[in-house]
Amino acid sequence: RGLLDRVASQWQRGYEATLTRYERALRQRNRLLKDALEVDGAARRAIASEMRPWTEMLITTGSEGVAGRLALLAALAPVLSATHREVAPSEAGLETHYLSREEYRPDESASECATRLAQSFDQTAETEGYQGYTLVGPHRDDIAFHVGGSDIAPTASRGQQRSLLLALLFAEITLLTDEHGHPPVLLLDDAFSELDPQRREHLVARIAALPQSIITATALEDLAPGLVAKATSREIQRGPHGSAVAA
């Protein structure tokens, strides 16, 4: 979910602002639901009335956010599947699934998402009143990755996890490059130390094709030798006043 929001904020104009409005409405609504647990009668009805516009804002911004996520997944999924085949050719095809209580179709519009979301709010209103927090909305949704028809989350080996992370990274770079006409600046933190030689080669090849990348490592030995030879290196040293870049 966090990955989708991060990529969508760079891929779609206005997505980040929509997400910010949604999160604000969610905080306000959850506060009111919690307050309602402490009162009853007229006071509880007053809180329900105060909560109504926040619910409407959640439906509006939430449906726009879900539609944005679905559009992103539709564009990202085939690219991700292709990059995963490059990184892990021995593994079965990778599939991406959007998981939600509302069971959205991959091509649903924002208005269709809003209809489903409004129905979910109606269905969970009583339970929310007992539990004191919002039970539906895109903040509850998730993504599942299937390899060979099975969800890899419960059983993925470290190798499978690394393959998926690299494939996601490469797919994100491809998608953003196609959208904006130029590649993003790549930031990698200690990415090489746990990669096997094959995955290192894939990562080095991708980095070499980018105009600019910033990579951190605890030791130069953790980086691919060919990459170090082409890079401008800086060492961070601990001094009396904290860490600093060595001259």
Give the predicted meaning of each segment.
Residues 214, 232-234:
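Hydrophobic/aromatic beta-strand patches that form the interior of the parallel beta-sheet core
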Residues 33-40:
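Secondary-structure edge/capping motif, primarily at the C-terminal ends of alpha-helices
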Residues 184-187, 215:
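Hydrophobic positions in the central parallel beta-sheet of the AAA+
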Residues 212-218:
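Structural recognition of the conserved hydrophobic beta-strand(s) that form the central parallel beta-sheet
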Residues 189-191:
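Walker B catalytic acidic pair
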Residues 1-32:
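Extended, charged alpha-helical "arm/stalk" segments used for dimerization and assembly
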Residues 42-185, 194-198, 202-210, 221-230, ...:
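Conserved NTPase motor "head" modules and their coupling/switch loops across ABC/AAA+ ATPases, GTPases
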Residues 29, 33, 62-65:
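A structural signal for well-ordered alpha-helices, especially hydrophobic packing surfaces
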